[in-house]
C-alpha cells in the first residue's frame, strides 16, 4: 500500500484521492496521536485552509474527525500555511492542520499537519498517524466529551502583528506589486506590506475558489514582471496558493529566485551579526552560483535533500538562522517554524530600504550558472546511479568541472526517470557533459 504522506503532507485530487472520508480519518488520527492526554484543559487543534473550492468540504471533514476524538477546534479560516503553524504555537494548541495544495492546480488539495509548537511532523509521527487511519476509529466519546468548534476571530490580526516584526525599518519609499495567486495571501500580504509603509499594488488577489494559481503566483511570473515594469514599481513579490513561498522581480522585470533571495538575506544577516555560525542551509537543487557567492563571503553552505522539511531539520539540528529552497521557501527560524512568504517579502524590502539599493543591485553577487537538465527513462531508478559505467562518467565530469560547476543525478519522486543536471560556466559545456552522463545512464536500461 502506497504511503499516504508525501514530502509535504497528504495530497491528491479533491474528492478523488483526497476524499472527505479520508480527511475525516486523518483528522481523527491526528487527534488521537497528537492530542495531549492528562491535560487540565480541553485539548484543541487549529484548522485553516486556502480558498480553493474543495477547502470547505475538507475543512468540515477534518474538523468532524477531530471532534469525534474529543478535541476542540479553533477554526481560523483562510490564512497562509505559516499563519496556521504560528497560531498552533501562539494558541498553545495540541496540533494544527492546514488544508492546501500550495502551488498545485485548483482541483488538487492537501492536508498538512503541524505538531505542538507549529513544527512539521517527523516520519515516525506521520507513520503512526497513517497506521491509525488504516485501523479505523476506536472508542469515541459521547455527550460533553465530543469536541467543539470555535471561530478564532483574532487569528489574522495576531498573525499580522507577528509578521510585522520582520520589517526592521519603514518601507515608505518603496512601491511593490504583489501577486497573491488568488490564494491565501490575498488579504494578508497586502495588509502586512501596507502596515510596514510600502505602497502596495495587489494583483491576482480576488479568490473565487476556482482561480487559485491559475496562470498567476510564484509558478507563473510573467504577469508580475509585466506589471512591475508597467507601474514603474521598485519590485514585485509573488506568493503561491498558501503563501509559504516568495519569489521576486526587480524593477526591470527580471525574476529573482529563491537562491538569489537567500544570497541577499544571508549577506544582510552576516553584516548584522545575525547569521548563526555564518552558515546558510539549502538543498541540492540550489544553483552553483549560490555556493560561489557564499564562498566569496566566507559563508558555509549546508546542503540537504529536496524539500523544506529537510531544510528545517538541518536548521533545528545546527541552530542555524537562515535556510531555504530555490523555489522560494525561505525559512527564518526566529520568525517561524516553516517557510513564510510574507516574512521573506518584508525582510527583502527592509534590506532595500536600509541600504537604499535596488533589488537588482543587492542580488548582483548571485550569478546563476547555466544549467542543463536531462530526464532519462530507466527500468530501475533506485540503482542505476550505482552502475560502474555511470559512476565513471560522473567522476570524469566532476574532475573536468572542478570548482567551476557541478553534476547531480537524482531519481524522480513520481516517475521512472533519473534526472541528470549539470551546471557549468557556459551552456555548451553543461550540455555536452549532461549528454555524456545521460547516455551512460540510458545504456543501463
Curated annotation (Swiss-Prot):
InterPro entries: A-D-PHexomutase_a/b/a-I (IPR005844), A-D-PHexomutase_a/b/a-I/II/III (IPR016055), A-D-PHexomutase_a/b/a-II (IPR005845), A-D-PHexomutase_a/b/a-III (IPR005846), A-D-PHexomutase_C (IPR005843), A-D-PHexomutase_C_sf (IPR036900), A-D-PHexomutase_CS (IPR016066), Alpha-D-phosphohexomutase_SF (IPR005841). Mg(2+) binds at residues 102, 240, 242, 244. Its EC number is 5.4.2.10. One of its GO terms (molecular function) is magnesium ion binding. SUPFAM superfamilies: Phosphoglucomutase, C-terminal domain (SSF55957), Phosphoglucomutase, first 3 domains (SSF53738). Its cofactor is Mg(2+). Transmembrane segments: none annotated. The modification Phosphoserine is found at residue 102. One of its GO terms (cellular component) is cytosol. Catalyzes the conversion of glucosamine-6-phosphate to glucosamine-1-phosphate. This is Phosphoglucosamine mutase. The lineage of its organism: Bacteria, Bacillati, Actinomycetota, Actinomycetes, Mycobacteriales.
Amino acid at each position: 500500500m502506497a504511503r499516504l504522506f508525501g514530502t509535504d503532507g497528504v495530497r491528491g485530487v479533491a474528492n478523488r484521492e483526497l476524499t472527505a472520508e479520508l480527511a475525516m480519518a486523518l483528522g481523527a488520527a491526528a487527534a488521537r496521536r497528537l492530542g495531549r492526554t492528562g491535560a487540565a484543559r480541553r485539548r484543541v487543534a487549529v484548522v485553516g485552509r486556502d480558498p480553493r473550492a474543495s477547502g470547505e468540504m475538507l475543512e468540515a471533514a477534518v474538523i468532524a474527525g477531530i471532534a469525534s476524538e474529543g478535541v476542540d477546534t479553533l477554526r481560523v479560516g483562510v490564512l497562509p500555511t505559516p499563519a496556521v503553524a504560528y497560531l498552533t504555537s501562539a494558541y498553545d494548541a495540541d496540533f494544527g492542520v492546514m488544508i492546501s495544495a500550495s502551488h498545485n492546480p485548483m482541483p488538487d488539495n492537501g492536508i498538512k499537519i503541524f505538531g505542538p509548537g507549529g513544527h512539521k511532523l517527523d516520519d515516525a509521527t506521520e507513520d503512526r498517524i497513517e497506521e491509525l487511519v488504516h485501523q479505523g476509529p476506536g472508542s469515541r466519546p459521547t455527550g460533553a466529551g465530543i469536541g467543539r468548534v470555535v471561530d478564532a476571530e483574532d487569528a489574522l490580526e495576531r498573525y499580522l502583528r507577528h509578521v510585522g516584526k520582520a520589517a526592521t525599518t519603514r518601507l515608505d519609499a518603496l512601491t511593490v506589486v504583489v501577486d497573491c495567486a488568488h490564494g491565501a495571501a490575498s488579504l494578508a500580504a497586502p495588509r502586512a506590506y501596507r502596515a510596514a509603509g510600502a505602497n502596495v499594488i495587489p494583483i491576482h488577489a480576488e479568490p473565487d475558489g476556482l482561480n487559485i494559481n491559475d496562470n498567476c503566483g510564484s509558478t507563473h511570473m510573467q504577469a508580475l514582471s509585466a506589471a512591475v515594469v508597467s507601474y514603474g514599481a521598485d519590485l514585485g513579490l509573488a506568493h503561491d496558493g498558501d503563501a509559504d513561498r516568495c519569489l521576486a522581480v526587480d524593477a526591470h522585470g527580471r525574476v529573482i529566485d529563491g537562491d538569489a533571495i537567500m544570497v541577499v538575506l544571508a549577506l544582510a544577516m552576516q553584516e548584522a551579526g545575525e547569521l548563526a555560525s555564518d552558515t546558510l542551509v539549502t538543498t541540492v537543487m540550489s544553483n552553483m552560483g549560490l555556493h560561489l557567492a557564499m564562498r566569496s563571503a566566507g559563508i558555509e553552505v549546508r546542503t540537504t535533500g529536496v524539500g523544506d522539511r529537510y531544510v528545517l531539520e538541518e536548521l533545528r539540528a545546527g541552530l542555524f538562522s537562515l535556510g531555504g529552497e530555490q523555489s522560494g521557501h525561505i525559512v527564518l527560524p526566529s520568525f517561524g517554524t516553516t517557510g513564510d512568504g510574507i516574512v521573506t517579502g518584508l525582510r527583502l524590502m527592509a534590506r532595500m530600504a536600509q541600504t537604499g539599493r535596488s533589488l537588482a543591485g543587492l542580488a548582483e553577487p548571485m550569478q546563476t550558472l547555466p544549467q542543463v537538465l536531462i530526464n532519462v527513462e530507466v527500468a530501475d531508478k533506485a540503482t542505476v546511479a550505482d552502475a560502474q559505467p555511470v559512476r565513471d562518467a560522473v567522476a570524469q565530469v566532476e574532475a573536468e568541472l572542478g570548482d567551476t560547476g557541478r553534476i547531480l543525478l537524482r531519481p524522480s519522486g513520481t516517475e521512472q526517470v533519473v534526472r541528470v543536471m549539470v551546471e557549468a560556466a557556459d551552456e555548451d559545456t553543461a550540455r555536452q557533459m549532461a549528454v555524456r552522463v545521460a547516455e551512460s545512464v540510458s545504456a543501463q536500461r
